[in-house]
């Protein structure tokens, strides 16, 4: 078998397109619209309570979470020979660079990959061939990069230490450039939301958090669609309740997961929650009854009797 370096093969830039954009989302510094093409080198930035979904050439969907900055570094189809009638096919190679924030990726399961789909942060490199996972790089001072695997198998490498580990479904790892070992950790289980109320009323809108062993905080995400393509709230909750009172009065999908002491976020549970308008104020009290009329004046005294 002759192995040819990938750089010597002919390729065509693949088509990446915007599937969803909610809130303040920019592509290359300009507002990003659904249906827009994302070229290689295209940088996607989301603001607070904003998100976007980009579909790569192989069908992989990359969800750019709120307050994130990501770049489509490569999105390519390489020409390959095969035993088909035409004698050729295309193999995909893709690389996403996360400078800040969180990406949720659902990679297409396909054998036609020239390289594993890769997500790169300043301190880590994650490679997959078909899976669902999250990559986060939120604190440039600590330089921690998180990887959490929801489905499939991921390879997470510490690029500074030339070390790494395979992460199967339901596990995660925190990678720091100063620590050589990549420790594989079991993610927290999905919380049970069945006992939580299905509605809250404005203006308070307080929604309780479920009990979950090992959780020191929670991640709560709110979207109008069950696929969470349009996330309108992304909240880290350290208390016992989350405030949903600023949401519009309609039905929402709430996604909740626990966060462990290392900062790894666990598996999700989803529940529909209705935000209700505040109850009408009570009617004003009736006016007080009018005061009683004053008593009539006493009759005048009788005239004196003269004899």
Task: Give residue spans per PLM region.
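Flexible, surface-exposed loop/linker segments and immediately adjacent secondary-structure boundaries
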Residues: 1-43, 56-203, 304-306
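Short proline/glycine-enriched turn/loop motifs at strand-loop junctions of beta-rich domains
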Residues: 19-22, 212-217
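Short beta-strand segments within Ig-like beta-sandwich modules, predominantly Fibronectin type-III
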Residues: 231-238
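Conserved aromatic anchor
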Residues: 203-214
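Surface-exposed, short loops/turns at beta-strand junctions within beta-sandwich domains
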Residues: 244-252
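Extracellular fibronectin type III
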Residues: 261-278
């Amino acid at each position: 078998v002759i192995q040819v370096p990938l750089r010597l093969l002919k390729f065509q830039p693949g088509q990446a397109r915007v599937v969803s954009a909610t809130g303040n989302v920019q592509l290359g510094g300009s507002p990003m619209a659904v249906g827009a093409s994302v070229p290689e080198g295209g940088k996607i930035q989301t603001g607070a309570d904003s998100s976007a979904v980009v579909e790569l050439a192989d069908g992989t969907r990359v969800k750019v979470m709120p307050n994130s900055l990501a770049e489509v570094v490569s999105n390519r189809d390489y020409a390959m020979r095969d035993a088909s009638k035409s004698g050729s096919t295309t193999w995909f190679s893709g690389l996403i660079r996360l400078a800040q924030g969180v990406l949720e990726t659902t990679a297409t399961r396909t054998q036609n990959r020239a390289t594993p789909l890769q997500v790169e942060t300043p301190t880590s490199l994650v490679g997959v061939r078909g899976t669902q996972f999250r990559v986060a790089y939120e604190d440039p001072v600590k330089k921690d990069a998180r990887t959490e695997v929801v489905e499939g198998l991921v390879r997470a490498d510490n690029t500074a230490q030339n070390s790494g580990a395979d992460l199967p479904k339901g596990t995660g790892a925190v990678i720091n450039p100063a620590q050589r070992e990549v420790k594989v950790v079991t993610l927290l289980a999905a919380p049970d939301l069945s006992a939580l109320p299905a509605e809250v009323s404005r203006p308070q809108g307080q929604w309780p958090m479920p009990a979950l062993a090992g959780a020191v905080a929670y991640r709560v995400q709110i979207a109008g669609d069950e696929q969470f393509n349009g996330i309108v709230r992304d909240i880290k909750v350290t208390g016992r309740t989350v405030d949903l009172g600023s949401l519009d009065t309609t039905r929402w999908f709430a996604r909740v997961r626990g966060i462990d002491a290392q900062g790894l976020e666990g598996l999700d549970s989803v529940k529909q929650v209705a935000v209700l308008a505040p109850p009408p104020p009570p009617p004003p009290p009736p006016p007080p009854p009018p005061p009683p009329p004053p008593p009539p004046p006493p009759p005048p005294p009788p005239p004196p009797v003269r004899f």
